[in-house]
UniProtKB/Swiss-Prot annotation:
Gene3D superfamilies (UniProt xref): YegP-like
Protein name according to UniProt: UPF0339 protein Atu5359
Keywords: Plasmid
SUPFAM superfamilies in the cross-refs: YegP-like (SSF160113)
Entries under Pfam families matching the protein: DUF1508 (PF07411)
Taxonomic source organism: Agrobacterium fabrum (strain C58 / ATCC 33970) (Agrobacterium tumefaciens (strain C58))
Record keyword Ribonucleoprotein present: no
Length: 62
């Protein structure tokens, strides 16, 4: 099962990481001073990402 994990880093900031069902970390967040802020970021991703497009910025445009 995919999951978000909330944790505190060495600087005391709240962060999250997103893990795949095989345990691999797929991405992680920036640091947040408040736990409520990191939880809001997770909810925003859940709400807004289902229709997100993929933009390949590695291709050259002329």
């Amino acid at each position: 099962m995919y999951k978000f994990e909330v944790f505190k880093d060495k600087a005391g900031e709240f962060r999250f990481r997103f893990r795949a069902s095989n345990g691999e970390i797929m991405f992680s967040s920036e640091g947040y001073k408040a736990k409520a802020s990191v939880l809001n970021a997770i909810e925003s991703i859940k709400k807004n990402s289902p229709g997100a497009e993929t933009v390949d910025q590695t291709t050259a445009t002329v």
